[in-house]
Amino acid sequence: MLVIDAHVHLFPDEVVCARESCLEGEPCFAELFGDPAARMASAEQLVAGLDADGVAAAVTCAFPWRDLGRARAHNDCILAAAAAHPGRLVPLAAVDPLAPGAAAEAER
């Protein structure tokens, strides 16, 4: 049976390494990932986990950051991860629809 994980998050290294700096002004991120024990994965860690668990592919979801610059960087991260792991990681970009410039980021 083909197993696909339909909702995973992977994060840019700068978010994984400096999680605390991303908490202010980002209540959703703080709620889900503010606890240092909350697991965050890079693309390489995610693919290794897929391999270990026999999962064929995963839909990698960006995070709906309020800060549009951070959202762009995260979208870039998941697009690059998908390009590096074709057929394994399927990107799903995210943007806060109320953020100024959100439409341009969504179209990109």
Give the location of each predicted region.
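Helix-coil boundary/capping segments in enzymes
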Residues: 1-108
